[in-house]
Swiss-Prot record:
Record-linked PANTHER family: CYTOCHROME C1, CYTOCHROME C1, HEME PROTEIN, MITOCHONDRIAL
Protein name (Swiss-Prot/TrEMBL): Cytochrome c1, heme protein, mitochondrial
EC number: 7.1.1.8
Mitochondrial matrix side: 316-325
Membrane topology: Single-pass membrane protein
Predominant location category: mitochondrion
Similarity comment: Belongs to the cytochrome c family.
Function: Component of the ubiquinol-cytochrome c oxidoreductase, a multisubunit transmembrane complex that is part of the mitochondrial electron transport chain which drives oxidative phosphorylation.
Taxonomic lineage: Eukaryota, Metazoa, Chordata, Craniata, Vertebrata
Domain Cytochrome c: start-end pairs: 108-209
Topology feature Mitochondrial intermembrane, residues: 85-281
Transmembrane segments: 282-315
Subunit structure: Component of the ubiquinol-cytochrome c oxidoreductase (cytochrome b-c1 complex, complex III, CIII), a multisubunit enzyme composed of 11 subunits. The complex is composed of 3 respiratory subunits cytochrome b, cytochrome c1 and Rieske protein UQCRFS1, 2 core protein subunits UQCRC1/QCR1 and UQCRC2/QCR2, and 6 low-molecular weight protein subunits UQCRH/QCR6, UQCRB/QCR7, UQCRQ/QCR8, UQCR10/QCR9, UQCR11/QCR10 and subunit 9, the cleavage product of Rieske protein UQCRFS1.
GO BP terms, alphabetized: mitochondrial electron transport, ubiquinol to cytochrome c
């Protein structure tokens, strides 16, 4: 009996260094087939492991990465050197009163800005997308806007005889153009075409900061910079040479409300007016945003309560699979 037990133990354990007979014996005792046993041979181990990159490849990849980074830096440096003559001064960010999340436009400033446009800017620049009716309720009453429109003569027609005629302006009329066509505008401004100011704030990078800096940034050209006749130096304008003469200066006009017409005040008011012209829905958009935030503050707790109590049954429901018998 003892000899039989020793023989069985030797078959299960096997000799030292030969694990396969012992494993085969264990598999046979447990009811497993011999083909299901894993073979721990050197070939199987080498196939199951993942070899990394060699040292030479790592060095090559590191060198390529350093060359790519150096080439990118050199390209940026050369581009900056080539475009140094085209460098323009970026406008600073000014603390406009309407830039707050809940801040509205200054409507008294809009009224003064329209006065600046009417007396200073309208001689060269048009505003094709702004009508006199747009001023009603913003900076003028309806009667005041009608009086402003009647100051200009608008071509209309034809009449019963088929001829065009001139009539006083109406609220539905748009601001008059200073020139009949672009060719006439270029001929009167030494070949430069004055841009339309309806959306100039939205059309320029920097918005009203750029327009304010451009209006107040005229200065004498630095030493070594020469400009041809009819051009003026402005560091905020691309190329620094602009064909528009300095349009504003201290006491360039008198405001109706008695505000001192300093250069910065005039530039601020006309920039505010141009911001309103480019975005007349500015105040309405912020009011709607505030109302939406208030409504969402009331609706979100209700939605959360509905989700928490109405859908908790479905969320905690468990499905049990019962196989067919």
């Amino acid at each position: 009996m003892a000899a039989a037990a020793a023989t069985l133990r030797g078959a299960m354990v096997g000799p030292r260094g030969a694990g396969l007979p012992g494993a085969r014996a264990r598999g046979l005792l447990c009811g497993a087939r011999p083909g299901q046993l894993p073979l721990r041979t050197p070939q199987a181990v080498s196939l199951s492991s993942k070899s990394g990159l060699s040292r030479g490849r790592k060095v090559i990849l590191s060198a390529l990465g350093m060359l790519a980074a150096g080439g990118a830096g050199l390209a940026v440096a050369l581009h900056s050197a080539v475009s140094a003559s085209d460098l323009e001064l970026h406008p600073p960010s000014y603390p406009w009163s309407h830039r707050g999340l809940l801040s509205s436009l200054d409507h008294t400033s809009i009224r003064r800005g329209f006065q600046v446009y009417k007396q200073v800017c309208s001689s060269c620049h048009s505003m094709d997308y702004v009508a006199y009716r747009h001023l009603v309720g913003v900076c003028y009453t309806e009667d005041e806007a009608k009086a402003l429109a009647e100051e200009v003569e608008v071509q209309d027609g034809p009449n019963e005889d088929g001829e065009m005629f001139m009539r006083p302006g109406k609220l539905s009329d748009y601001f008059p153009k200073p020139y009949p066509n672009p060719e006439a505008a270029r001929a009167a401004n030494n070949g430069a075409l004055p841009p339309d100011l309806s959306y100039i704030v939205r059309a320029r990078h920097g918005g009203e900061d750029y327009v304010f800096s451009l209006l107040t940034g005229y200065c004498e050209p630095p030493t070594g910079v020469s400009l041809r006749e009819g051009l003026y130096f402005n560091p905020y304008f691309p190329g620094q040479a602009i064909g528009m003469a300095p349009p504003i200066y201290n006491e360039v006009l008198e405001f109706d409300d008695g505000t001192p017409a300093t250069m910065s005040q005039v530039a601020k008011d006309v920039c505010t007016f141009l911001r309103w012209a480019a975005e007349p829905e500015h105040d309405h958009r912020k009011r709607m945003g505030l109302k939406m935030l208030l409504m969402m503050g009331l609706l979100l707790p209700l939605v959360y309560a509905m989700k928490r109590h109405k859908w908790s049954v479905l969320k905690s429901r468990k499905l049990a699979y019962r196989p067919p018998k």
